[in-house]
């Protein structure tokens, strides 16, 4: 039985993906289940986080968002029994890759998959659903009538975040990085209040948002990265991102800025402006649910909520055509370079 692993060279950030033979080990741990994988979504691997958590190995398992059928359960498993259909996110320290036919996983990382949800949809939406719920429910207290700016709304995560915000009755503004993205966002229903096309670099995001909100500013901002310096000092890949000053300018009083920029630096004038607005800055790190067991029950509730919303049609994920396992190596190389737009799912 083959599984996909990655190997990182010691000299640079280059990652190599390799298939390796893996033993089909029976369940020996009391709280573990053995799952036959039906689908596994591909996501970017945060090698920096793995290094910081001292989780580096010679060969690290690849693929964490999985859906499948329970084959066997440990003695103390209470949530599942054989033949149950399940979905979940494997922990960072999982010994088994999700890109493998059979895996072992602790029962507390899985929830039941609704019957009418397909394997690929379940695996493809689970991570972005957790990210969206974390950003909008736990970090920014989304409620009906609030205005939300979701940067890069045509990405797989952005699409799910927009759908969740609309479901809660919020007014959504989003940015598009290309003509295709703009057309995709304009086709979404319910419709977005304003799509800001930033592809040509001429449109000012802050001005557009203030105009849309009557000068009051937006209540919640979920960024997709920000520029910390002037355009001359930033790499080309960051040129389409808004400057941190733009985000602070467009935030309303009591607003929430949810950022994915782990190296965010705020100068005293920035902090003073946020203080005057009574605004907050929160960091979106969805791995925190798996890095600590302190809120395991809340995490399982989020997983169930994501599946219920997928089943009810609230979430309509942006998925690419499913691919077979033998194509996973090439696809992961593309995903690792952040070159994909739609979510790629491997179907078994």
UniProtKB/Swiss-Prot annotation:
InterPro entries: ADH-like_N (IPR013154), CRYZL1 (IPR042633), GroES-like_sf (IPR011032), NAD(P)-bd_dom_sf (IPR036291), PKS_ER (IPR020843). It is found in: Early endosome. Pfam families: ADH_N. Coiled coil: none annotated. Belongs to the zinc-containing alcohol dehydrogenase family. Quinone oxidoreductase subfamily. Component of the FERRY complex (Five-subunit Endosomal Rab5 and RNA/ribosome intermediary). The FERRY complex directly interacts with mRNAs and RAB5A, and functions as a RAB5A effector involved in the localization and the distribution of specific mRNAs most likely by mediating their endosomal transport. The complex recruits mRNAs and ribosomes to early endosomes through direct mRNA-interaction. This is Quinone oxidoreductase-like protein 1. It comes from Mus musculus (Mouse). The gene is Cryzl1.
